[in-house]
Each structure stands twice: as C-alpha cells, then as structure tokens.
C-alpha cells in the first residue's frame, strides 16, 4: 500500500538552488524512493510566473512520487501542514551593502517565516535553513516559532562538510566514501572549522596518513572556507547544484538515518563544547529514527579551541546584531 504523501515546503522556489533541488525531491532523493511528496513552493509575487515555469517542467518529468504541487506567495499557505521546510530563499548581499543591513533584511524574512511555521506547520516539521547567513537565519526562525521544538530548526553545514571530504580524499588518495568521522564546527561562513583529527579512511587515521600541520592550517582550512568565493570567481555564479545536493544529504540523513556515521549539521546548542545555548552551531551528529544526536565528549585541543571560539565570536556578533528585531 502506498504511503501517505509528505508535504515539503521550499522557499525561494524560482531561484537557482531550488531549480537544482526540486527535481531531485520529486524523484525521491530526499525522503526515499517509496515516499510520495507534495511540493509547496513559496516565492515573491513577482517570481510567481517563473515558479509556474518550473512546475511545468516538473509536470513534464511525470515523476511517479510527485503527488501534488502548491504555488504561493503566502508563507501560511506554503507551510501548511509541512513535514519538511527547506528555507532556501534569502536576501542576497548587494553591492555596497553592509553586513548589518543584510542581517536586518533577512531578519524580516525569517521572523515572518518562523511565525508562519509556528502557526501552520506540522509540530514535527524538520526545518533546514539554506539561505545565508544560514545559522543566524535559522536562529531567527527558531526564536520566532516559540511553540515548535527548538530541535526542529537546523542550518546547512553539509556543503562545507562535503567540500572538506572532497579535499581530504584528494590529499590522502583515499575514496571519498571511505572517509568517516569528519567534523565541521561553527558558522556556515569562511570562519568555520573543518576538523579531521578524528577522521579515518578505510579504518586508518587520516591525521597520521596526511601528517601535515602546515597543509591543514594554510591550505585545507582556507580552501574549504573560501570555496564558495572560488566558485563565484570561476563560474560567475554562486554554487547552486552543490548546495542543493548538500540540502538533500542533510534532510535525507536526518529523516532516514546515517547508520552510525558522523555528518555535520548546524543545530541549536545545548551548552556543550563551550557554545552558549540556542546558538545554531555546526557540530558532528549521528542521525537515527528521524532524530539527530550530537557526538559528545570529543577532546578539543588548543588549536581547535581557538578556531571554534573564532567562529563562535562571529555567530555571537550576528545574534547581537538581530536581537532588537526579535520579540523573545
């Protein structure tokens, strides 16, 4: 017997990331090849015609799992009974725009979306914020949805995680799928800290295999941190397909589990690892039965502490920059 359809809301539905995302969701890559989905697509009034064009293409794929599509510019319609919400749309930084103005512009969007989720989404909704600044946007949405569990709100660090995996595979000569126990700490920004001290490849310690502190400090960490900028420089456009792929990975693992493997998610802090409560901070997690659980008790050396505190400082600055815009 067919499963009842799950409702997946996607914001910024006319955008580049969504264009790489929607067809894969409809194909079963997000929730499984036996799970029908209803897509609930949100974008601005002026983007509705473009969204309709994307839906025409979705129709033309005749996906067996696509049970319906809703197109709207109203968050309360888009998030109605949503089981998953992918918050992809955000205000991009325009030329000459100060960071604080970017934070304020996004705070307006994510307070409205958080409040709408609070009002109409499933109480078990899984929220992933992709739109930047992702961690702080997720924090704003979470704070605007007091009736939903905080744990429902996450930010995407999976792109950083996947970028780090790829760099480590290239450096070590090991297959990317063989690398386990990688962590990426902190903010989805150039300050984040990819940490392979615990990582293994085919059971061997990657740290011993690579054995190059200078490469770690001067090449690996900056390459992962600045990868997005490098792609814009090369392509003239920001990374969309790889971001969509990471969003799929993040939610699929959250829903279907990681079989004991570590992945990175931006989640509300419980105070562990010296991160103040509620800050949405990238940590290694293991997912099982639709829940994530942070990997606990990892040793933090002096270099790691410095890196983790550096990315935390940026997140605290962002939090303080939007505090006056939040009610609670």
Swiss-Prot record:
It is an enzyme of class 1 (oxidoreductase). Its EC number is 1.1.1.37. NAD(+) binds at residues 12-18, 106, 113, 130-132. InterPro entries: L-lactate/malate_DH, Lactate/malate_DH_C, Lactate/malate_DH_N, Lactate_DH/Glyco_Ohase_4_C, Malate_DH_type2, NAD(P)-bd_dom_sf. The active site is at residue 188. One of its GO terms (biological process) is tricarboxylic acid cycle. Pfam families: Ldh_1_C, Ldh_1_N. Keywords: NAD, Oxidoreductase, Tricarboxylic acid cycle. It catalyses: (S)-malate + NAD(+) = oxaloacetate + NADH + H(+). Substrate binds at residues 93, 99, 132, 163. Disulfide bonds: none annotated. One of its GO terms (molecular function) is L-malate dehydrogenase (NAD+) activity. Belongs to the LDH/MDH superfamily. MDH type 2 family. PANTHER family: MALATE DEHYDROGENASE (PTHR23382). Catalyzes the reversible oxidation of malate to oxaloacetate. This is Malate dehydrogenase.
């Amino acid at each position: 017997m067919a499963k009842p359809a799950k409702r997946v809301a996607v914001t910024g539905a006319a955008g580049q990331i969504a264009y790489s995302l929607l067809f894969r969701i409809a194909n079963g890559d997000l929730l499984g090849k036996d799970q029908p989905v209803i897509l609930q697509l949100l974008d601005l009034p002026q983007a509705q015609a473009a969204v309709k064009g994307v839906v025409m293409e979705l129709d033309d794929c005749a996906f067996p799992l696509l049970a319906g599509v809703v197109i709207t510019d109203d968050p309360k319609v888009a998030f109605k009974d949503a089981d998953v919400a992918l918050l992809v749309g955000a205000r991009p930084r325009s030329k000459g725009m100060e960071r604080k103005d970017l934070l304020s512009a996004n705070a307006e969007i994510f307070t409205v979306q958080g409040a709408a989720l609070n009002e109409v989404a499933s109480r078990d909704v899984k929220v992933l914020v992709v739109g930047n600044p992702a961690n702080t946007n997720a924090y704003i949405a979470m704070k605007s949805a007091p009736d939903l569990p905080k744990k429902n709100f996450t930010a995407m660090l999976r792109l950083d995680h996947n970028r780090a995996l790829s760099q480590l595979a290239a450096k070590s000569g090991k297959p990317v799928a063989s690398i386990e126990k990688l962590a990426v700490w902190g903010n989805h920004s150039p300050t984040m800290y990819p940490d392979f001290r615990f990582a293994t490849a085919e059971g061997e310690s990657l740290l011993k295999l690579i054995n190059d502190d200078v490469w770690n400090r001067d090449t690996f960490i900056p390459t992962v941190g600045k990868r997005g900028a490098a792609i814009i420089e090369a392509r003239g456009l920001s990374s969309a397909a790889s971001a969509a792929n990471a969003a799929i990975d993040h939610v699929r693992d959250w829903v279907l589990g990681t079989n004991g493997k570590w992945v990175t998610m931006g989640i509300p802090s419980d105070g562990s690892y010296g991160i103040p409560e509620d800050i949405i901070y990238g940590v290694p997690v293991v997912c099982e039965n639709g829940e994530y659980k942070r990997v606990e008790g990892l040793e933090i050396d002096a270099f790691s502490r410095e890196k983790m505190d550096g990315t935390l400082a940026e997140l605290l600055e962002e939090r303080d920059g939007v505090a006056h815009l939040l009610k609670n």
